[in-house]
Amino acid sequence: MARKTKPLTDTEIKAAKPKDADYQLYDGDGLTLLIKSSGSKLWQFRYYRPLTKQRTKQSFGAYPAVSLSDARKLRAESKVLLAKDIDPQEHQKEQVRNSQEAKTNTFLLVAERWWNVKKTSVTEDYADDIWRSLERDIFPAIGDISITEIKAHTLVKAVQPVQARGALETVRRLCQRINEVMIYAQNTGLIDAVPSVNIGKAFEKPQKKNMPSIRPDQLPQLMHTMRTASISMSTRCLFMWQLLTITRPAEAAEARWDEIDFNASEWKIPAARMKMNRDHTVPLSDGALAILEMMKPLSGGREFIFPSRIKPNQPMNSQTVNAALKRAGLGGVLVSHGLRSIASTALNEEGFPPDVIEAALAHVDKNEVRRAYNRSDYLEQRRPMMQWWADLVKAADSGSIVLTHLSKIRLVG
């Protein structure tokens, strides 16, 4: 018959004195108190490892910081793990690792790592817009939460205040960006499943609205308005550059001199600055080349064609033309992105081939099969088309287009 160990008492533990050599006091079921020759008293739990069956011991801490009842609770917890073939010490190490990972893998920190990858494939302005939206609306709610603890309802709750203020388009973009962060977390091994896949379905869909724009026959009044507006020469040139090249606001504002091929009369925009992440070449009309000649002395030999007045080593803000349109009284009637719509309408009404127009707008065919077979950029066909557009703008600017039914600029779309 095996000898039964008598459980320890606090009185016995307190009375235990150090000896020349270390010795043990036994509480039973593997729990012992090691009395060191130095006088310290250390709790230990002896057990067999589930896989190797090797005898080992687990430290529970020192007495009296860890009381007798505390040590027994820790022993009970370890025995529960052992009953499931889980090594208590390995479990403890994993918890420490998870705790450390949680501190370095909060939503904010993971989002930052994702954003550093994302910004290499989008324009600087767009990358900044992504970060500002997360910084403003998401990080205050879930930025400090470990990515492993985030559930779908956590994300929905974080976005709900944005819905409450009626910013449904912002809600749509936030859901998309959050989902990209969570997919990044999955792809880097931080989480097994993506909880954000369907969070957009928890919100009302925004009504799609066209960018405020005007018809081509209203170009003369637009040109007159901008010619007489109180704006700087650089801003006026940027407005004309964006109008003549049919580019997006950020693409136009961030144009660099080293992207211009004067011999070929071309502007080669690298993929990194394009919305669709594809190189785009713009044939430059006589009017566009004239804008460049005007900007040479104004840019002062700097990298950017349209340098910022406040920070000359940086480009003008992509919203500069938008602000100028508002100051000219066109707020709500025309936005800078709408300049592309004017050109698109004019070119389509003139009968230019749709594929050539789409190429000029740097649109990507949504039909993947068709896109795979049709890789033409229609560069040569775009040259006369862009010159036709520049001639139309010039005629509108000189007032040589006969106006009809134009009492005031009106909203289109």
UniProtKB/Swiss-Prot annotation:
It holds the Pfam family Arm-DNA-bind_3. PROSITE patterns: CB (PS51900), TYR_RECOMBINASE (PS51898). GO terms for biological process: DNA recombination; provirus excision; symbiont entry into host cell; viral genome integration into host DNA. Keywords: DNA integration, DNA recombination, DNA-binding, Viral genome integration, Virus entry into host cell. SUPFAM superfamilies: DNA breaking-rejoining enzymes. InterPro entries: CB, DNA_brk_join_enz, Integrase-like_cat_sf, Integrase_catalytic, Integrase_DNA-bd_sf, Integrase_DNA_bind_dom, Integrase_recombinase_N, Phage_int_M. Residues 209-386 form the Tyr recombinase domain. NCBIfam families: PRK09692.1 (NF007246). This is Prophage integrase IntA. It comes from Escherichia coli (strain K12).
